[in-house]
Design a protein with these regions (language model features):
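Conserved P-loop NTPase
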Residues: 65, 69-134
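P-loop NTPase motor core
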Residues: 1-66, 74-76
């Protein structure tokens, strides 16, 4: 089941009782998981860059996996990057990678080797890629 996005779902489920939404979402996801249903949820966040919250609802504890996608500026161009933040019970890649949406699907690109601070909103261009000699 796909919930795209949590903010629209919140308006439908708890239009007058927003404080009940988190509990309602928890109960629904737990019931669906018991039935063997996979739930994919998207959440659009304001880019504050100062905090790396992954949901305005405090619902990250419900998830088995979190993938963050973000636009960044690189050399006066907007680029898309993604990173796997969480995969429950799994050793996953912690790399930040560029990606493109093409006519044939999503193309995962290169690691962002020469930059730091990408997800925090203050990217810094480093002189060389990690592990390289000057």
């Amino acid at each position: 089941m796909v919930i795209d996005s949590l903010s629209g779902f919140e308006l439908a489920v708890a239009p007058t009782f927003r404080e009940d939404f988190r509990e309602s979402l928890f109960r629904m996801v737990a019931a669906l998981a018991e039935l063997g249903v996979t739930v994919l949820m998207t959440s659009e966040l304001e880019d504050r860059y100062t905090d790396l919250r992954f949901s305005p609802y405090g619902s990250a504890f419900l998830t088995d996996a979190i993938i963050v996608q973000r636009y960044i500026e690189v050399e006066s161009r907007l680029e898309r990057v993604m990173a796997v933040v969480k995969v429950r019970d799994s050793a996953h890649s912690k790399e930040i990678r560029q990606y493109e949406i093409t006519d044939t699907g999503i193309a995962i690109g290169e690691r962002m080797l020469r930059f730091e601070g990408l997800l925090g909103g203050r990217p810094v261009h480093t002189a060389q890629a990690p592990g390289q000699r000057p």
